[in-house]
Amino acid sequence: MNNKLTVNVDKTKLMLFTPRSVHNMPIVQYNGVVIEWVKTIKYLGITIDENLTFVPHVNEVTKKLSQLSGVFYSIKYLVPRTTLLNIFYSLVYGTLIQNIIIWGGNSEVHIRGIRVRLNNILRSIMNVKVGDLDTNDLYNALDILKYYDIYKLFLLKLVHFCLYQRPDVFQEHFFHLMPNDRYPTRNNKIKLPQIRLNIEKQSTNFNCCKVINEFEN
């Protein structure tokens, strides 16, 4: 290649993004080596699946939080709460926020496992059992946002970044401002994108528009 880049065939995979099952995929070769077709692949820290549901990634996050929950339970008597909180923000919070704007809008069926394990970890930090402390009080006591609040926070950060720190082309592509009938000089509503499939309600674009409108209300 002219730019002196070479393809690492051993790390190269093929994936077809489609909502339907496709069989008998064509054989693709590069320099005589057959490239493998895959249904999921990890790229830049996120597991991408052929249907773009990001459920495999959610499952990986759930599994990691489950392992960390066991760690917190084991060490809660050994280290002070401040240390537990430092570990929480380093390992748990860091895992949660990584690419959350991409996969965080998944359905509650899949997200519930993350929320349950997050609650368990915070109970270990506070050294309380289930029922000893209301969930809202648990988060308030540690000054930690709940899962969906974390997701909304990062969506709002993305909206602010696109609206105020990027060229107008970002606004034109991602967000369509609607005139305010009550205050004509304001454009504080964003039109929700048209969707054809339920899975599109999980998209970053749809949820960015939704959360900014809720925030304005």
Annotate each language-model stretch with its function.
Residues P26-V28, F54-V58, P167-D168, N213-N217:
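Short conserved micro-motifs at the rims of enzyme active sites and ligand-binding pockets
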Residues Y73-L85, I102-S107, L133-K146:
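Acidic, serine/threonine- and proline-rich low-complexity regulatory regions
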Residues N2-K39:
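Short, conserved micro-motifs composed of acidic
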Residues I41-N51, L65, V92, L96-G104, ...:
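Short, conserved catalytic/metal-binding micro-motifs enriched in Asp/Glu and His
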Residues D168-F206:
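Amphipathic alpha-helical
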Residues M1, S66-S69, Y73, Y93, ...:
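Amphipathic alpha-helical interaction motifs in eukaryotic regulatory proteins
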